[in-house]
Amino acid sequence: MPDPAATRAGAARARATALARAGERLDRLSLYPRPVRRERVRIVVAPFAFRLPWLRRFDGYAAWGLILLRSAAEDDDLLTHELCHVWQLQHRPLRMPLSYLRSGYDGNPYEAEARAVVAATRRPAVAATAVATATATATATATSA
């Protein structure tokens, strides 16, 4: 029978490695004045949280220094997307979450920026203009608020 402590330690190492990979993807970009600070970011696999009606449609959720994931399956794109939200929150701790009240999820410029970041860092062929466009939209929306 496997040792539960060793299993937990292995899972924690895997999450830390995945977080480092996501951070390296974000480090290639200069969307914000400072790079994402990931030292205190915790990843918690919490499938029960995604039974809540307002989280049901998501596979991940970021709140400041916490990233909740529906499953333990490694998905670098999802983790990069959520870590991008942590980065956004580090630079716009009030404006970013309040933007969901104004524009909802589907039309939210911070969501567009996180999706563009994933696309731009996944494939080198994707033009950097996708990130620049999403950032310009997020900035224009945030400054008009």
PLM segments and residue spans:
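Short, flexible, glycine/charge-rich loop motifs used to bind or transfer phosphoryl groups or to couple energy/partner
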Residues: L31-R34, F50-R51, R57-F58, L68
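Short linear elements at protein peripheries
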Residues: A5-A6, E24, T80, A116-A127
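A metal-dependent hydrolase signature that marks the N-terminal structural subdomain at the beginning
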Residues: M1-A46
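Polar-ligand-bearing catalytic/cofactor-coordination segments
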Residues: A63-S71, T80-L83
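Post-HEXXH active-site segment of zinc metalloproteases
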Residues: L52-R56, A62-A63, A73, D77, ...
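Pocket-edge structural micro-motifs
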Residues: V45-P47, R70-A72
